[in-house]
From Swiss-Prot:
This is Putative cell wall shaping protein YabE. Suggested to be involved in cell wall modification. Disruption phenotype: No visible phenotype during recovery from stationary phase or sporulation efficiency. One of its GO terms (molecular function) is hydrolase activity, hydrolyzing O-glycosyl compounds.
Length: 407
């Protein structure tokens, strides 16, 4: 009985020892397994942690962390790199971004931090005039939408001055607003404001319209009125009242295109100053006339009797008028009369072959005079009567008159 108990006890010890040995072996194996792991620092999308791993490569490590990678992801070092002790592994997941350029959309995956970095990464060439939304310094986020409207050049002819301007505007109206161009309602824009602008079809012509009022002052000619004067010898005239020109203001609406006048319309007239008639007294007194002639010195006077009038020769001649200051005139007659010093002298120019110089005559509508001058254009039955004023000479004009030679 004692022997049997000993045997049983021995078996229990054996089992206990075996169990202890098994536990010891397992612990040793576990310890050995843990001791063979590599210590690695992993940064996942900016979050760092330290792990121990049996992974052979960086790719294996990411798989053990249940990270599904894409070609666009940023992994440092590369996935095929062997794991070493105290290795730093950085993983940045690419984000999906929708990029639209000039209306064409495509989806990209990128680890770029900002819009500008993404465009550089994708080799998208942009100009400072391009419209980029959001701005290039905006941080990239998942499913972000980026829109780029490339700028193009518009040729603007503004009042004849041409310049090229970069823009992303799609219509003429939007372009003018974007450029803050001062356009008046009267200005002409070509093409129309709602016309589309596209690359290669972007020419704008601006015609500047200006409306101004132009006031022009004109002279109003005075009338000449003659009145009979019984106290004045017949054939003589005397200025009773000098004429004075009036002033007329004409208001014109002037339209200019690019500074050049294209139309003018009279909109108003107003008299600024009334004209004043010239009044001439015409003698009607019947008496023996005195004829004043001037010698070559321009000073002496001669009195001629009217008795020759009844026997004088009457002729019909063409007549014109002149003054002392007419073109080509010296102020002195062919017989030496100084007309400038004797403005009231009654003198006519004649053809000496028809009417001798020095003859006393009576000219219809002019009165008594002396044939004291000649002229290169005075040939045959033609005379030129002298007036001290141009206005009187102009009024005489060119007419046919009767002349009586008194001596």
């Amino acid at each position: 009985m004692k022997k049997l108990f000993s045997v049983k006890l021995s078996k229990s010890k054996v089992i206990l020892v075996a169990a202890c040995l098994l536990l010891a072996g397992s612990g040793t194996a576990y310890a050995a397994h843990e001791l063979t792991k590599q210590s690695v620092s992993v940064s996942i999308n900016g979050k760092k942690k330290h792990i121990r791993t049996h992974a052979n490569t960086v790719g294996d490590l990411l798989e053990t962390l249940d990270i599904k990678t894409r070609d666009e992801d940023k992994i440092t070092p590369a996935k095929q790199t062997k794991i070493t002790a105290d290795m730093d592994v950085v993983y940045e997941a690419a984000k999906p971004v929708k990029l639209t350029i000039n209306g064409e959309e495509k989806t990209l995956w990128s680890t770029a931090k900002t819009v500008g970095a993404l465009l550089d990464e994708q080799d998208v060439d942009v100009k400072e005039q391009d419209q980029i939304d959001p701005a290039i310094d905006t941080d990239i986020s998942k499913d972000m939408k980026i829109n780029i409207e490339p700028a193009f050049q518009v040729t603007v002819n503004d009042a004849g001055k041409q310049k090229k301007i970069w823009t992303t505007s799609t219509t003429v109206a939007d372009f003018l607003k974007q450029q803050k161009m001062n356009i008046k309602d009267e200005d002409k824009i070509k093409p129309a404001l709602d016309a589309k602008l596209t690359k290669g079809k972007a020419d704008i012509t601006i015609t500047r319209i200006e409306k101004v009022t132009d006031v022009v002052e004109e002279k109003i000619a005075f009338d000449v009125k003659k009145q009979e004067d019984a106290s004045l010898e017949k054939g003589k005239e005397k200025v009773v009242q000098k004429g004075k020109e009036g002033k007329l203001k004409k208001h014109f609406e002037v339209v200019k295109e690019n500074g050049k006048e294209v139309s003018r319309e009279l909109v108003k007239e107003e008299t600024a100053e009334q004209s004043k008639d010239k009044v001439i007294a015409v003698g009607t007194k019947q008496s023996s006339p005195k004829f004043e002639t001037v010698s070559a010195s321009g000073d002496s006077k001669t009195v001629v009797s009217r008795s020759n009038e009844s026997t004088g020769k009457v002729m019909t001649v063409s007549s014109t008028a002149y003054t002392a200051s007419c073109s080509g005139c010296s102020g002195h007659t062919a017989t030496g009369v100084n007309l400038k010093n004797n403005p009231n002298a009654k003198v006519i120019a004649v053809d000496p072959n028809v009417i001798p110089l020095g003859s006393k005559v009576h000219v219809e509508g002019y009165g008594y005079a002396i044939a004291a001058d000649t002229g290169s254009a005075i040939k045959g039955n033609k005379i030129d009567v002298f007036f001290p004023e141009k206005s009187s000479a102009y009024r005489w004009g060119n007419k046919t008159v009767k002349i009586k030679i008194l001596n």
